[in-house]
Amino acid sequence: MDWKTIFMNISIDSVIIYTWDKYWVIIPRDHVERLLWGELIQLYREKCFNNVFVLNWPGGFTNLRVWTLCLNILNTLLENQLSFYNLSKIDLFKKAYEKWFLPRFWVIYIWQKRNIRLWDFENNEKIWQYSFSELEDLEEVKKFENVFVEDVQDMEYYPKWMDKYLKYHTLLNWTDIYLVDNKTADWKWISIDEFKLKPLKSISPNYMMEPSVTIK
């Protein structure tokens, strides 16, 4: 990636855009369908970026769907001048776990109240999936140690007993990804080059959802 790269985290409830000169925009999911296209066009006019690094999925349906659609449309209008670099949070956090930066288990909330999951980075698999109301009452879940959650704008989606767990938020820049502990302000970093990402001309949302119907 060259220096004219913008960085987007579209996998949280309020999408964050960073640029090489520290310009950044936050767009809440409640306004994304109304504001995104105008913000994206204005950003391109001001910055004339060549590359887009996207921290993608798991995340909310609206953000993933609208952002990937608008990015693809923009690249079509620009006759494929843009290159996308796509990284999932599961791949990011797995790398962080392997470096001893993060605990083994991650409580994932993908912005549907029936889809709160526990991910095991040791075995790289989902252990369980519950609704929000079920999660409030699960004593066996409360006994889990070595767990973290991602800091988001709307923390009310997590049960109060999860306050004891580590909360991390993610920052991006030209060369590195930073993981910041909200309680201690300690931070760790991972070089983007470690992921050996290939340039893409289009980008797809991955909703981390299994089909609910079978077509015969």
State where each predicted segment sits.
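Oxyanion-binding and handling regions
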Residues: 1-20, 31-35, 45, 83-216
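Glycine/charged-rich beta-loop-alpha catalytic/anionic-binding loops adjacent to active sites
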Residues: 22-24, 51-55, 156-159
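Conserved short-loop catalytic and cofactor-binding motifs
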Residues: 24, 58, 196
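Catalytic-loop motifs flanking and including active-site residues across diverse enzymes
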Residues: 36, 66-70, 89
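N-terminal small/polar loop signature for handling phosphorylated ligands or for N-terminal nucleophile
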Residues: 38-42, 49
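DPxDG-like acidic metal-binding loop motif
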Residues: 51-56, 62-84
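Residue-level signal for short, function-critical loop segments
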Residues: 57-58, 211
